[in-house]
Amino acid sequence: MKLKKQIRFYNKAMSRTALNELIRRLIDRFGMMCTSHILDQLKTLGFHQATDASFSLGIDDLLAAPSKWWLVKEEDQQGFFSEKQNLSGNLHTVETLRQLMERWHTTSEYLKEEMYPKFQLTNSFNPVYMMSFSGARGNKSQVHQLLGIRGLMSDPQGKIVDLPIQGNFQEGLSLTEYIISSYGARKGVVDTAVRTADAGYLTRRLVEVVQHIIVRKTDCGTTQGIFISPIQDRDRSKENVFLQKITGRVLADDVYINRRCIATRNQDISAGLANQFKNLLIQAISIRTPFTCKSLSWICQLCYGRSLSHNNLIELGEAVGIIAGQSIGEPGTQLTLRTFHTGGVFTGNIVGTIRAPFNGRIQFNSNLVYSTRTFFGHPAFICRKKLFIIIDDGGDKVDYSLLPTKSWVFVQNHQYVESEQLIGEFRTTTSLLKEKVLKYIYSELNGEMHWSTFVCHALKHTQGNAHFTFGAVHLWILSGGIYNPKVVLSFPFPKDQDQVTIAFLSTKQKNCFDPSVNLLQSNSVSFQNPKLEEEKLEEEKLEEEPDQSSISVPIFLENFNIQGKKQINRVLVPFFYAPKRKTKRKKRKNYPNCILKIPRSGFLHRNTTFCIWNDSQYKSPSPGFLEYSDSPEKFVLIPEEVHFFEKSSPIAIQNKSIIRADTQITAKKKSQVGGLVQIHKKKTKLVVKILPGYIDFYRKKNKKYWYKTFVSPRQNLGEDFLSEKNYFQTLNKPHRKKSFVLLRTAVEYKIPNPKEIKVPFCPDLLREEDNLHIQMSNCFYGDGGKKLQKGIQLIQTCLIFNWEQIDSTESETSISITSIRIKNIVINTIQFSLRKHSDSAWSQKKNQISSKRTFPPVLDKTQSFSLSGKIQLPSNYTATFRSLNNEKNMFLILSTSDCFRIHLFQTKKNDNIQNKSNPNKPINNHFVGFFGHLHSIENLYPSSHFLNYNKILFNKFCYNFNIFEIPNCYILDEFQKVLIYPRINHLWNPKKMRYRRYSKNRYPTMNLGQLLWENFAICKNESFSESGQIIAVREESLVVRLAKPYLATPKATIHGNFAEIINQGDPLITFFYERFKSSDITQGLPKVEQLAEAQSNNPVVQNIEENFRIWNQDMTRTFGSFWGLFISTKITMEQGRIHFVDQIQKVYQSQGVHICEKHIELIIRQMTSRVLVSDDVIFNVFLPGELIGLSRAQRIDRAFDEAIHYKTKLLGITKASFDTPSFISEASFQETARVLAKAAIQGRIDWLKGLKENVILSNIIPAGTGKKTNYSLFARRRRRKQNTKTRKNNLFSLNEK
């Protein structure tokens, strides 16, 4: 009867957790003996009930959820859509993986929650349901893998495998699913032998660190403790954690409530007292921990607290260090071996959602949000501050919601939302710890790499080829095969990215080249001129700065004859390009030099200089200055010799002296000419000028002598003096009455007539007075008297492109370049095409700059090239040649497998194509052709690229404009918009039509060189099947080069340079992204080992450094530099220890394992018990860099006057194992020879205070019953010392008497 009054009656199902709680309360109330009898009765009752029920588990008891298959099917469809988005470049690999994990986790959780209600409705006595629900065997996750889906698994490195297991153990797994499942299983294909060894090694290191810690004293006398507050933890799970932390501890200070003491110091905390603290909402209580124990190599009873075995204070002599190491290592071993753990995806419910309660229009402040991209690649907004959201249905219903800061908003302002539509997400709890992860993306194709904007062109590292992005950017790999012949090919092209059509012939065929091959359309004439490539020299620098608005291309030319004709509105100009060479060659012939100036926009306006002609005979042979004579057709160059020296250089000649040629100026410099010397200073340099010529002294001033004037050859200057093409200059000396003149030699140049200059262009182009024509004019270097240096071009002939302005419409000229080289034959062609701006729908905006590369025209005929090596390749290859690593014999071939052709209008219903025209009624408008050329069209269809499916009708009504029927066609142009007009019999005025009226029927622009994504719609019923680049446009089809787009987010790293050749499998992009730490210890305890070894990437180590910096700033301002540093160090170490314990505890708690924090604190205490000496102020005590105990450093610091400078050191468990008081224990752990040799040199003494060293030497261990023997041994030694001191004192006292 007494027993019934003391125990409450529980009328509920007893799960494993409830049974553990019952046993704990029975032990607290009745003790161990009575509790054992009660548990025996429960055991007998359980066996009887199991025998009467006769439950058995069969395969028929496994009931699968009926909704599994349609959920999996829907998931596959969403996965297919995400994969298409990834292939199109809208999502990158990380976002695709995140979407995959999120979808399958949602599906798995839905099936898991649906499983148990089904058991309750169908059969509540199902053996599987009762077994897992009661906690007797199995849990929800394990039953879910039996009946639902296995889900996503991780590989041996802990990364998620992106192929989910859709089957379960009831249905069976396929071979692929079994291989993936074995990664997370205990005995599969991937064996756990290595992981078992790692787990055992972790336990061994933990025991090695704390094996010497034994309870040897009741109280150490400390007054310090750590504070724990229950106010911070309001939810039930956190309250249970608070009770687990303080139960079994000892109070470090009295606890008061309203001046009434409810617990005293050194009182152990029972379960009842802990609940009382929780219910009374105590602010904070101070408890004793192993961190605050004063003992050196042991621990006292009160700092340890109660024993976990009998729930009383720990007994003296208990080896708590061994228990602590085993309690941490053994759960990790079990989890690693998958004894009671199943693999899966770690996730947490940390996101809350807000959905629309009804249909309505949403309103919020748009200034409080900014656009961003979610982790899954979806567009969204982020709240800068708290955001109020209002949903109004237009009637009486109004809903108000509040989103906290940093929440996601998935709708726009004033958007209409439907009921249950997702509006936003916010975090419901504190976010988990994150870690930075690198994700590498590799190329799937061979080809060229290209990107658009938002890529920094400066290299991330000087010695590397990595570029970082500052915005979302698409990276394209243009397909192409890399060809490396065994012999050196003889037809390298002069520039990269030139596209030609090549027929590879046999090696026996001779070089064949047809100069009359037509490069353009049927109504045009091509100019081609074969020329043997001359020897190249280094290009000389020009003094003028380059124009940033144009591209200057140096061209090396030779006079030759050109035959051909010019078409209206189109001009072709051939030229030859001379690349720069570093090696010096033989002296080249005196050929003119030409610089082609092409605007970056690709367009020329009227009266614009497009080419500068430099004749080498008009280059200054030496320094000097220019002077213009009286004749307008001549100018002269007065040469002089100039030298620059340092101010400290010794000069052997004097100023205003006259020297001869080869006179020594300095020790290493001689003059080349003779003449008058002029020396002056210029900033930090000394300038020495030698004016060549000769002096003429005269006594009487002759009026014919003029200062700085020209004199003609054989001119009489008086006194029978005749000049010979000299420059006349008088020089007066002030100290002499005589004067003299300096007659300097001048080089005379004749200004050429522009019409007489022999330029390499066709003479007909300069003489014909047509719409397009080229004008020539001379440009001089500068005014008279301007000084110049050697190699300056004195006269430049400028070629100006011009045309007649026919009407008020503005015009401009587009430029196209074609360059081909076969062996030593170089063919370069520039094409100028006149274009006009009109008001029609397909005209572009004025001065629009095309960002696309200018492509050469499509070749109408296939040119034949020959090889000098023995190579045979398939014919009709369209190749884009790119050199690799400066190796000329390697190039990129664009074969038919890298391209595909799209035929336009294949799906039209009307297949009766009529390509007719009415020659009697021409159209006076100008239409744009394929290659950006304007045509004045009289016969519409032969000269413009239209495909018509309806009869053509043209009627001319008046002079100002034309009205005609719109055919069912569209215009495709390199620069213009692509418009489609499907309506028939619609009359329109092209000069009055505006762009916005036809915006609904307009399709995206397609240009040559344009990059297009997969499923890009080119018309109503046509789309691209794969991503690629348009490389050719024909009347009936497009040729598209295969390409693969990759999306790179901001702060990503791109490996490689623009237009670089990439092989399949080469790294392209490196993503830096954050993911939540799973704290999974199933792969050899990586997280626990990372924390225990105190690695540099450990978040605890990083937080300690950051906290010290913050505390040091605050304490220094309050207490000064010295005390601030001391206090901040102490606070930082205490907080770091507590944070260390919390992190290790979270790892185990995530797997459902709880470890007593006292055991973790013992490990952390040993890891933080060493300091590093940083200064050798006290000699012969410690060496700089020596590791010593913290308590020892504090004792010596108090004993000496001068302070010891040291800093705290966080040691990993492996290094802490080599820094113990016993060298015998260290030698038995690792590196036996090194440890024993070092101990012998240092003369270390092992006092045999630990367990391990006594076991090695076969002594009685100082724990348990052996503690008395150890204590008596130390007591006898202490009494001997005292007796020795007493005898010595008595002896001294007798001698004094």
Swiss-Prot record:
* Localization terms from the record: Plastid, Chloroplast
Name of the top EC class for this enzyme: transferase
Q: How is the cofactor bound?
A: Binds 1 Zn(2+) ion per subunit.
Cross-referenced InterPro entries: DNA-dir_RpoC2_beta_pp, RNA_pol_beta''_euk, RNA_pol_Rpb1_3_sf, RNA_pol_Rpb1_4, RNA_pol_Rpb1_5, Rpb1_funnel_sf
Q: Which UniProt keywords apply?
A: Chloroplast, DNA-directed RNA polymerase, Metal-binding, Nucleotidyltransferase, Plastid, Transcription, Transferase, Zinc
Is Metal-binding among this UniProt entry's keywords? yes
Stretches with biased composition (Basic residues):
1278-1288
Tell me the cofactors it needs. Answer: Zn(2+)
Q: Which GO terms describe its cellular component?
A: chloroplast; DNA-directed RNA polymerase complex; mitochondrion
Using the UniProt annotation, give all residue ranges assigned to the region (Disordered): 1278-1297
Q: What reaction(s) does this enzyme catalyze?
A: RNA(n) + a ribonucleoside 5'-triphosphate = RNA(n+1) + diphosphate
Reported EC number(s) for this entry are 2.7.7.6
- Its domain of life reads Eukaryota
Write out the GO MF terms: DNA binding; DNA-directed RNA polymerase activity; zinc ion binding
Q: Report the main location listed first in the record.
A: plastid
Residues that bind Zn(2+): 220, 293, 300, 303
Which GO biological process categories is it annotated with? DNA-templated transcription
Give the Pfam families listed for this entry.
RNA_pol_Rpb1_4, RNA_pol_Rpb1_5
Q: Which SUPFAM superfamilies match?
A: beta and beta-prime subunits of DNA dependent RNA-polymerase
Functionally, this protein is described as follows: DNA-dependent RNA polymerase catalyzes the transcription of DNA into RNA using the four ribonucleoside triphosphates as substrates.
Which family does the entry's similarity section mention?
Belongs to the RNA polymerase beta' chain family. RpoC2 subfamily.
Q: Which protein are we looking at? A: DNA-directed RNA polymerase subunit beta''
- Protein encoded by which gene: rpoC2
